[in-house]
Amino acid sequence: MKVAVLGAGAWGTALAGHLAARHDTLLWARDAALIAGLQARHENSRYLEGIALPDALRYDADLDAALAHGAADDALCVIGAPVAGLRTLLRAMRDARCVPAHVVWVCKGFEADTHLLPHQVIAAELPEQRSNGVLSGPSFAREVGLGLPVALTVASASAACRERTLAAFHHGAMRIYTGDDVVGVEVGGAVKNVLAIATGIADGLGLGLNARAALITRGLAEMSRLGVALGGRAETFTGLTGLGDLILTATGDLSRNRTVGLQLASGRSLADILGALGHVAEGVRCAQAVLALAHAHAIEMPITEAVCGVLFDGVAPRDAVSGLLRRDARAE
């Protein structure tokens, strides 16, 4: 199978490496210098340092060539760009006049200014593209790059997209499950990043494992309430793309969002943290969108509100925790 991966960040690179073990895979990035480095060293030293990529993996900075590679009905196009760059990439795809038959995206979050989920952005920019879906689940790019076991879910209304994605990814140490709850999968992937900042703050303040468990559990309730209000199914949030991804991101040391919380608890400013991180922390980007949607649907999301207070309103991390503890008692 021919597979084009658009976006050579950590996640796009790791997935391309996995795909190249079985398929004719082309990894695209608009940065010609990055592509030249990949071609010379078969390593993404900028985003996935120290992990050798398969010799069979090919690289290109020409979007037209990448789209042509993944356009056919028996091929697949994987969008690896983050949510912040998704609309720009989709418009470039539209302008190229080469819309792939099957598209799957792996970004997580809400578009910051519109509060739209990725599938809504894709519907707006590529309305003629109907065989598409989201691939998500508890996964760190570095572990996938190392070939360690991982389980993901592809969700799509299109049976053809589910089958094509399954055929591409389900091999080696990667197990793929299928479903059709695109909204639920996307909401889980977005909200868990905000909640991971909360658990990072709690851990950074030394509040203990009891507090971590409480935040994860009550955070899952927040995720589910918002997801159902937006059209997702409640059972999705107890699966890989809800609870599974939340546990990993809230507790794993490779989690950028958890790192943001830990550093905030230590007293560092958000600007300093993001500058040193060098990678996207989607929880910071989409926290305000999550809270705005909660308010629009009259949904209580106190943990999310506390995180936004720390990130954007100057609330001290310890004061944010105290505010959560002062909330009135209620039935679970």
Swiss-Prot record:
Enzyme Commission code: 1.1.1.94
Major localisation: cytoplasm
SUPFAM superfamilies: 6-phosphogluconate dehydrogenase C-terminal domain-like, NAD(P)-binding Rossmann-fold domains
Organism, as annotated: Burkholderia vietnamiensis (strain G4 / LMG 22486) (Burkholderia cepacia (strain R1808))
Catalysed reactions, as listed in the record: sn-glycerol 3-phosphate + NAD(+) = dihydroxyacetone phosphate + NADH + H(+); sn-glycerol 3-phosphate + NADP(+) = dihydroxyacetone phosphate + NADPH + H(+)
Function: Catalyzes the reduction of the glycolytic intermediate dihydroxyacetone phosphate (DHAP) to sn-glycerol 3-phosphate (G3P), the key precursor for phospholipid synthesis.
UniProt GO MF annotations: glycerol-3-phosphate dehydrogenase [NAD(P)+] activity; NAD binding
Binding-site list for sn-glycerol 3-phosphate: K108, G137, S139, K192, D245, S255, R256, N257
Similarity section: Belongs to the NAD-dependent glycerol-3-phosphate dehydrogenase family.
Pathway linked to the protein: Membrane lipid metabolism; glycerophospholipid metabolism
Signal peptide: none
GO-annotated cellular components: cytosol
Name of protein: Glycerol-3-phosphate dehydrogenase [NAD(P)+]
